[in-house]
């Protein structure tokens, strides 16, 4: 079988994930480490492989990920979006399934900036009436 690479990029908060799907056996590596070792929490692991499980392509592709920035949860979200985009590049018919389950939507929520005159983004200094 010919080695074919499919690419996808995902972002979440300040994390950026570059995903490469290759025909293979289902091996997942993140930053050259096994994904079970990189993501210790089962919830983040499940979130990350959601597109592969939904489309039943878990055993069909090897996934290689380069991710940086943010925390582990944000990185898992970025990887999830990257995998979904790479799956569409490989098999365009999967778009409807992934779109319906919301896996192609970029989560635009990010940290609100701190404003001057306030202690945090919205927290005002304590008010004293007298």
From Swiss-Prot:
SUPFAM superfamilies hit by this protein: Ribosomal protein S5 domain 2-like (SSF54211)
Pfam family, one: Ribosomal_S9
Keywords from the UniProt entry: Ribonucleoprotein, Ribosomal protein
Entry's Gene Ontology molecular function annotations: RNA binding; structural constituent of ribosome
Name recorded for this polypeptide: Small ribosomal subunit protein uS9
A single cellular component GO annotation: cytosolic small ribosomal subunit
NCBIfam families: PRK00132.1
Gene that encodes it: rpsI
Annotated source species: Aster yellows witches'-broom phytoplasma (strain AYWB)
Entry's family note: Belongs to the universal ribosomal protein uS9 family.
Keyword field contains Ribosomal protein: yes
Gene Ontology BP term (one): translation
Keyword Ribonucleoprotein (UniProt): yes
């Amino acid at each position: 079988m010919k080695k074919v690479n499919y690419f996808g990029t995902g972002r979440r908060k300040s994390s950026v994930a570059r995903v490469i799907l290759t025909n293979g056996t289902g091996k997942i590596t993140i930053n050259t480490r096994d994904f079970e070792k990189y993501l210790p929490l089962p919830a983040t692991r499940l979130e990350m492989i959601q597109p592969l499980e939904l489309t039943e392509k878990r055993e069909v592709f090897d996934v290689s990920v380069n991710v940086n920035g943010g925390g582990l949860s944000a990185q898992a979200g970025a990887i999830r979006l990257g995998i979904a985009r790479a799956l569409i590049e490989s098999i365009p018919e999967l778009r409807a399934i992934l779109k319906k389950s919301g896996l192609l939507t970029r989560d635009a929520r990010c940290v609100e900036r701190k404003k001057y005159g306030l202690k945090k983004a919205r927290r005002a200094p304590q008010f004293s009436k007298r």
